Amino acid sequence: QMFQAVEIDGKAYWDGGFSGNPTISPLVRECSANDTILVQINPVKRRRTPTTASAIASRVNEISFNAPLLKELQMIALLQQVADLGHCEGQLWARMRMHRIESDYLNELDYASKMNAEWAALTALRDEGIKAADTFLAEKGHHLGKRASLDLSALLEGM
């Protein structure tokens, strides 16, 4: 598949999955908030191994889009393990608390659903996003401002 860049004010922008989504590091270095909430739309793992050509192509797409993010999360996990709390940069990484909003609904969608711009599909995504955020807040919201609710080591285990 091939998509053209979107031009805004004379500058070309590519889909993040092809060039890397915005990095997390500026949130550590340039933001006073210690909590970062990752809204994950592509599953890291699947319950079932894809067997059809379309399911395999969809999974390849998910892996490709997740690769830059997973690499950065791996770097963050490593930096947090070795951070020198006496060093300014080390303190920034050590204080970072990662959280993740995810949805089983999104895990059931295939690649073709990403091309669906019909109003019903968009409102279903919005509604599922609200539901996922509400679930996150009910189950893990009490961690905000206190501790990470996303275990980076467990997420990256076996990657």
Which residues does each PLM region occupy?
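Patatin-like phospholipase
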Residues: 1-159
